[in-house]
Amino acid sequence: MIKKSIYLFGALILPLLVVWIFRMQYGYIYHAVDDVTINYSIINGESMLLPYIGIVLTKTLVIIQNIFPMINIYFIFLVGTYSISFSVFIFLLRKRKCKILLIVILLIIEFTLLKYFTYSVVAYLLATSGVLLLYKEEKTILSSIIIFVGFSLRVQVIVSVILLLLGIVLYELIVNKKKEKTVYLAIVTTLVIVTNFIFVKTNSEVENYITWNNKSTLIRDYPEINYNEYKDKLANENISKNDLESYNAWIFAEKNVFSNNMLDRLDEIRDNSKKYDLSIKNNIIQIFSNELLKVFIYFIVLIPLLYRPKKIFGHLSLVMPIALIVLLSIRQRMVERVYIPLIVIFIFSFIIYLQDIFEKRNYRLLRGTENIIFSILSLIMLNNAIQYGTDNLYWFVHQSFPHNKVYNELLKNNEKNLYIFAGYGNIINSQPNVSKVFVEKDKLTKNMLTLGNWQTFTPQYKEKLDDLNVSDSNNLLSSALDSDNIKFVLPEKSGLMEKVKTLFKEHYNKDVNFIFQEKVDEEVNVYVLRSDVSE
């Protein structure tokens, strides 16, 4: 009993300790703009983060944030769920003979994966740990909660996780007859999807935003449209070079220009051959030119050499991660924060289900040393992957938070004005660090925006503009023209200025200029947008 208690305590504490060590060693832990954006939203009580985070989860986080306003609930939640997922993996290894070695490997992977600490990665880990806990243990309620939170944290991971674990799910359903647990998995998954669907369909403002955002995402997630290649087609659709360049530069907070219809026409400019790379040669080159994927494929090939897959279940477990990676390549979406968590959750599920869906081949020459050989070769591959990431992907580099006090004071001293920045990075720098438990909330402001991000046109976006007396929340640029309380914080030679000027000339036949108001620092000034004013 004591040993079991100690093991459980260690399983809970060790992953948290790893996060703490990484935080102390390498500093700032948020590596994606999205997590900072979400963190601001939760602190500010904004509970609509669809289509990415489920409505039940965000509302719950906002309620808890309101109860405990002095602490950063989202940061605690993200670190906690990241650690809990590894705690579950460690717990599931408690009966394995070589559990110490496996736990060390898990903790090394956890430490390394913190380089990609984002809500998407946490969602993959948490949902996977919940599914494995559901089938391996008699903890239906706990595992169902973990699955629900994991799938709610990033709704888009549902399909990938289910496909990756398909061999395991079918094994448990067909061989172990765990129909009831499979039904629980189906119910929880459906609950996440249905609650979001009902919320969207019963809120017209949210539905309008989701519709627009889906159209916008269709364009942004594919390779950028080259103007010269589609010049004639774009001209036929009355889409100018400046329209395309503005959109690609995330300048689209003007629905009179970037309407649903315009986005549909822009998306239809390319045929599917430009969106999806179906060339076998190109995909092979794409995958094998990636050192991490190359190591992973070697690992996949090594498994059936030493372990015989049991029927279709083992084969599916090996095929699905490769299939998902190939689909990413075809989709031209081969980004580290997507394929690395897929690799990691495959490794974890393989470790936990090795004895269930694989069996040793028992080569006479190896004389029962298959496990030792496999462990040594796997450690060599892991070392090579970490070495490559360290040398080429900056995995272990200290990052500090570049807080800009001048920007922050500008916003704090002029709270009735709306300040538009050229990039979201400048907005992040203008705010206090939210990558910690206690945030300096007195330094947080709401009166800043960019001309386009994934929250543009959300209900909270429109509410923010209404609070700042912006005349038309669907057309921020038009509202900014000749306004005294909408200002731009830009470098003196910002490319944004020319794009906005051209947009007004092409779509409204108006000549506009950015008029200097005050200096912020050596490189950045505050401007207002005025009509019919010569330079």
Question: Which sequence ranges carry the predicted segments?
Answer:
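Extracytoplasmic catalytic/substrate-binding loops of multi-pass membrane glycan-assembly enzymes
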Residues: 19-40, 46-61, 68-72, 397-399
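Signature aromatic-anchored transmembrane alpha helix within multi-pass, membrane-resident enzymes
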Residues: 100, 180-190, 358-387
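Hydrophobic/aromatic-rich transmembrane helices and adjacent perimembrane loops
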Residues: 123-124, 159, 324-325, 331-355
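Hydrophobic, aromatic-rich transmembrane alpha-helices
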Residues: 85-91, 279-311
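Extracytoplasmic
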Residues: 396-404, 412-416, 423-483, 498-518
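Membrane-embedded, lumen/periplasm-facing catalytic core of multi-pass transferases
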Residues: 198-236, 379-451
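Transmembrane alpha-helix segments characteristic
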Residues: 102-107, 309-328
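Membrane-interface alpha helices of multi-pass inner-membrane proteins
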Residues: 108-110, 140-157, 161-166, 186-198
